[in-house]
């Protein structure tokens, strides 16, 4: 999972929603890995038992018991395989939805950064306008009080 941000905007803090989300993601990852381990172990154990039970023996009663055991083990293998398929589907959905969530978070972060840049730019433009206005007033006062202007008007 991609939890790293882009070029940061300077808002600090190592805790909060991001740390909580990372802890929740780690916990979910551990639970999913445990499910995978359990299901794979079940498939392997049941397959091993089917192979062990499938040896042909003489008494018909024992053969029917072994057949029942094989069917039971095969059923457990199918259940474990079904659980693995559901897990894969859940992982795909999680990847899709967490991808959208992290994308939305990134978009919101970028919007906030651009809003801050727009504010900074507006303040800079206002300061430049104030400076230009003050300089223009100063130039006008020098022009109207200068001796050269008086000689040009005569």
Swiss-Prot record:
An example Gene Ontology biological process: regulation of transcription by RNA polymerase II
GO CC terms of this entry: mediator complex
Signal sequence range: none
Pfam families linked to this entry: Med22 (PF06179)
Sorted UniProt keywords: Coiled coil, Nucleus, Transcription, Transcription regulation
Main localisation: nucleus
Coiled coil: 102-141
Listed InterPro entries: Med22
GO molecular function: transcription coregulator activity
UniProt subcellular location: Nucleus
PANTHER family: MEDIATOR OF RNA POLYMERASE II TRANSCRIPTION SUBUNIT 22
Function of the protein: Component of the Mediator complex, a coactivator involved in the regulated transcription of nearly all RNA polymerase II-dependent genes. Mediator functions as a bridge to convey information from gene-specific regulatory proteins to the basal RNA polymerase II transcription machinery. The Mediator complex, having a compact conformation in its free form, is recruited to promoters by direct interactions with regulatory proteins and serves for the assembly of a functional preinitiation complex with RNA polymerase II and the general transcription factors.
Family (UniProt): Belongs to the Mediator complex subunit 22 family.
Quaternary structure (record): Component of the Mediator complex.
Protein's name in the database: Mediator of RNA polymerase II transcription subunit 22b
């Amino acid at each position: 999972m991609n939890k790293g941000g882009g070029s940061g905007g300077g808002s600090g803090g190592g805790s909060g929603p991001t740390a909580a989300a990372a802890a929740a993601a780690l916990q979910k990852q551990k639970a999913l890995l445990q499910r995978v381990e359990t299901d794979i172990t079940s498939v392997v154990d049941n397959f091993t038992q089917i192979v062990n039970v499938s040896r042909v023996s003489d008494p018909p009663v024992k053969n029917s018991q072994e057949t029942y055991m094989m069917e039971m083990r095969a059923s457990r293998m199918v259940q474990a395989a079904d659980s693995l398929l559901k897990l894969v589907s859940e992982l795909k959905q999680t990847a899709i939805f967490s991808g959208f969530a992290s994308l939305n978070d990134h978009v919101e972060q970028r919007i906030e950064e651009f809003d801050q840049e727009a504010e900074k730019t507006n303040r800079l433009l206002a300061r430049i306008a104030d400076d230009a206005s003050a300089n223009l007033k100063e130039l006008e006062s020098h022009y109207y009080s200068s001796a050269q202007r008086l000689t040009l008007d005569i």
